[in-house]
Design a protein with these regions (language model features):
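Membrane-proximal interfacial segments on either side of biological membranes
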Residues: 3, 92, 97, 106-168, ...
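Fold-core signature of tandem repeat domains
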Residues: 147, 174, 195-204, 209, ...
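Terminal hydrophobic membrane-targeting helix
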Residues: 19-114, 179-181, 195, 207, ...
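N-terminal Sec-pathway targeting helices
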Residues: 1-17
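Conserved positions within tandem-repeat grammars
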Residues: 179, 200, 300-302, 307, ...
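A structural feature that tracks compact, well-ordered secondary-structure segments
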Residues: 186, 198-201, 212-214, 314, ...
Length: 584
């Protein structure tokens, strides 16, 4: 039987020699090229590598240098300076299994079509060192650079590329659906397409982001805690564009969000030093959803277009489609503002249930009246005001056609609707306004005051008067708020300067000094050119007996006198406004 022993010995020796020879050949440049060509020609993978290294001192370790692997379908690609494969006994019974896979200085691209069959490989540990990972999902890209870390074990299953295991990774940068993160560190567990992160920290726009939570298999982010600190974020987008862009973000559900010292800036808007907490709030397709959401937010400075607000404090409750504004305070210039109310998203209705404006200084924007003739911006249909108090306000309009200014303005709105079905107007309520002094196109008025009552389809003044020098002006205004909003206006002047109307753009009257006169007009408030719709009459008489009776047609005063009833001589003007300025 000695011959059998010798045969076995020589057979084993030949096998070892063959293995060693094969290993030596494979490690040559010629052998490496042959293996690359063999795989590329007979599988769905395109493979190239510069060298295969193996050492008898580390028999379980195989090193692949300058390796490139990609699928013909394009759903996976890997390029790396070096890939180390560590074998164990399981590798011989399960092809494709490795005790450890290390990818160094690599670049990995994965599409949403990739699955466990894309690269039938698994490992006890998958480790990445300074690797770039890029995943495409339709038109959206997740891009991570400088990734270092690992997942154990790594066993892709079905459409899942990660399997079940624990992970810990760091990355120099991560672009997640346009959100630029840097210096990322995270750890947690992964189960299929769902993973949890026990800790996630990152730098966001020079600030700090810290979070704990999970991502569901459906792609929804569930955040237990999210902390944002010292973030400085800029965008070229307007608020409208920014809101539209959120529709493409993945769904987010947050139990608790805390923000401190945040600065945000975009096109014609800026938020400085935002702090606050938000609880139990979800965003799905750019829309918030909650049944018991709460928000406490403070902002040191807020700029919207050219309007600047400061020291804003708000307390909100969110239920279904409704936001209850339990508290909203702030400053506008030197004024103090306080409001409560609610917003209903389903009906697009804003109710301001109480409000106070003290020492308000407000300059009307250009074309403000034209804006009121147009429909309101999309997204809001109704605005109702209740219990609104204004004290010691200053209102200014500097447009050159008809500038005006009102000082020491005081007003009260018991209830009124100012927006209905997207149209501006006054419905269903009453208001009163008074001012210490006013100037309308260089005509000074003293103690003007107005009370107005509005119904379902019309509005009218019940009191409307002011002193002008030694004279008195009484006015009446009534409008129907449907269609072109036809209106009627009457001005009765008693002992007033006869040239007031010429200061207001009308043809000079043939009257001198103080006079009694009446101006009656009918027109359409929603016309593009209101003056061209004006029709009416001007009649009056001064102290010298000079009279005027002129018709007004399409905004032009006739030079030809018309028949009118004699204007009665009025008694000397009496001040009907008390010195204390109270409205009677």
């Amino acid at each position: 039987m000695k011959w059998l022993g010798r045969a076995v010995f020589w057979l084993i020796t030949l096998v070892i020699i063959f293995i060693v020879a094969t290993a030596l050949v494979v490690q040559t440049s010629w052998g490496t090229k042959q293996i690359s060509a063999l795989i590329s020609d007979n599988t769905r993978y395109k493979v190239s590598l510069s060298a295969i290294s193996h050492s008898l001192s580390s028999p379980s370790l195989i090193s692949l240098s300058d390796i490139s692997i990609s699928t013909v379908s394009g759903d996976f690609a890997l390029e790396a300076a070096n890939v180390e494969l560590t074998l164990d006994w399981r590798s011989f019974s399960e092809p494709g299994w490795f005790a450890r896979i290390i990818v160094q200085k690599g670049d990995i691209e994965i599409s949403d079509a990739a699955d466990s069959g894309t690269l039938p490989v698994s490992a006890g540990l998958l480790q990445l060192n300074q690797t770039t990972v890029r995943r495409t999902d339709g038109n959206r890209v997740i891009d991570a650079e400088g990734v270092t870390g690992g997942i154990t074990p790594w066993q892709p299953q079905g459409s899942d590329l990660t399997g079940n295991g624990k992970y810990q990774f760091s990355a120099n940068s991560l672009n997640y659906y346009g959100l630029p993160l840097k210096n990322i560190l995270t750890q947690g567990e992964v189960s299929g397409k769902q993973f949890t992160f026990d800790n996630l920290t990152a730098t966001l726009e020079n600030g700090l982001l810290t979070a704990t939570g999970r991502r569901s298999a459906e792609g929804q982010w569930q955040l237990d805690n999210l902390l944002l600190n010292d973030i400085r974020w800029q965008t070229p987008q307007s608020l409208t564009q920014l809101a539209d862009s959120t529709e493409g973000l993945p769904d987010i559900q947050a139990k608790n969000i805390t923000a401190t010292n945040i600065k945000l800036e975009g096109h014609q808007w800026a938020v400085n030093y935002l702090e606050g907490t938000v609880k139990n709030l979800a965003f799905k397709q750019g829309r918030w959803q909650t049944d018991n959401g709460q928000a406490d937010i403070a902002v040191a400075d807020l700029t919207l277009s050219e309007q600047h607000f400061s020291d804003i404090i708000s307390t909100l409750e969110l239920r279904g489609d409704q936001i209850a504004v339990n508290r909203l305070t702030g400053r506008y210039d030197k004024s103090i503002l306080r409001f409560t109310g609610d917003w209903n998203r389903a009906t697009r209705t804003l109710n301001i249930t109480s409000g106070v404006a003290d020492n308000l200084l407000y300059s009307f924007p250009e074309q403000w009246f034209s804006a009121l003739q147009e429909s309101a911006p999309q997204g809001i249909d109704t605005i109702r005001l209740q219990d609104i108090k204004v004290s010691n306000a200053l209102l200014i309009d500097t447009q050159p056609v008809f500038p005006f200014q009102l000082t020491n303005v005081n007003g009260y709105i018991k209830t009124i609707q100012i927006l209905k079905s997207g149209q501006w107007g006054l419905w269903d309520g009453e208001l009163s306004v008074s001012a210490g002094n006013a100037t309308f196109n260089r005509v000074e008025l003293h103690r003007p005051y107005l009370t107005l009552t509005a119904g379902a389809d019309s509005a009218a003044t019940t009191q409307f008067a002011a002193s002008a020098g030694e004279g008195l002006l009484k006015m009446q205004f009534q409008t129907t708020l449907s269609g072109t909003a036809p209106f009627s206006f009457t001005l009765q002047a008693t002992g007033a300067d006869s040239q007031i109307l010429s200061q207001w753009g009308w043809q000079p009257a043939p009257l001198t000094g103080s006079a009694n006169y009446t101006l009656r007009l009918d027109g359409q408030l929603r016309a593009a050119d209101i003056r061209s719709t004006l029709n009416g009459m001007l009649s009056g008489q001064d102290k010298q007996g000079n009279q005027i009776n002129r018709a007004i047609t399409q905004g032009q005063m006739s030079n030809t006198p018309v028949f009118a009833e004699p204007v009665p001589s009025a008694p000397p003007a009496q001040r009907v406004i008390p010195d204390n300025g109270e409205i009677k």
